Amino acid sequence: MVSRRVQALLDQLRVQGIQDEQVLNALAAVPREKFVDEAFEQKAWDNIALPIGQGQTISQPYMVARMTELLELTPQSRVLEIGTGSGYQTAILAHLVQHVCSVERIKGLQWQARRRLKNLDLHNVSTRHGDGWQGWQARAPFDAIIVTAAPPEIPTALMTQLDEGGILVLPVGEEHQYLKRVRRRGGEFIIDTVEAVRFVPLVKGELA
């Protein structure tokens, strides 16, 4: 039985078009208040993005649900997340698949996320301190790649690390950003534009 605040959010997400019950169940199962600073705990189940420090944010629940739904996951999906951040999106993915790989360029955020995931007994996640633009070649190929910050263009490395039939979901752009879904079909990449979005930029190269 979920709390009224959680149920209200789930109802709102359904109204906004989220249909995958597995995704909604994962959102209900992950305590979002554990991934935000104490000052924002009262807003944890509001359908808004919140700051997590280091110039980064925890995404709006609608956007987490939308991007996760677009990945078309199965329990066997090999998943790469670019931008571990607070670890919230990571936790949602960990409830849906057998194993998640996640890359974060800010060491402090990576450590905090690992601690949160461990405290929630989510041990099916591998995290790495690295440049998200480069993906995680040693663990490739992936059935699904999700990027939680916006590059100005789609990183080539991420496209090449998609397996046949794999899906990449990411925001793209600088001043004007759009959520894109890229599907690999043989040697081709089919790119669909989903909706206008606003994310922090995906910083290239420099680790922190």
UniProtKB/Swiss-Prot annotation:
It is found in: Cytoplasm. One of its GO terms (molecular function) is protein-L-isoaspartate (D-aspartate) O-methyltransferase activity. GO terms for cellular component: cytoplasm. Keywords: Cytoplasm, Methyltransferase, S-adenosyl-L-methionine, Transferase. Its main location: cytoplasm. Gene3D superfamilies: Vaccinia Virus protein VP39. Its EC number is 2.1.1.77. It catalyses: [protein]-L-isoaspartate + S-adenosyl-L-methionine = [protein]-L-isoaspartate alpha-methyl ester + S-adenosyl-L-homocysteine. InterPro entries: PCMT (IPR000682), SAM-dependent_MTases_sf (IPR029063). GO terms for biological process: methylation; protein modification process; protein repair. The active site is at S59. It is an enzyme of class 2 (transferase). Catalyzes the methyl esterification of L-isoaspartyl residues in peptides and proteins that result from spontaneous decomposition of normal L-aspartyl and L-asparaginyl residues. It plays a role in the repair and/or degradation of damaged proteins. Belongs to the methyltransferase superfamily. L-isoaspartyl/D-aspartyl protein methyltransferase family. PANTHER family: PROTEIN-L-ISOASPARTATE O-METHYLTRANSFERASE, PROTEIN-L-ISOASPARTATE(D-ASPARTATE) O-METHYLTRANSFERASE. This is Protein-L-isoaspartate O-methyltransferase. The gene is pcm.
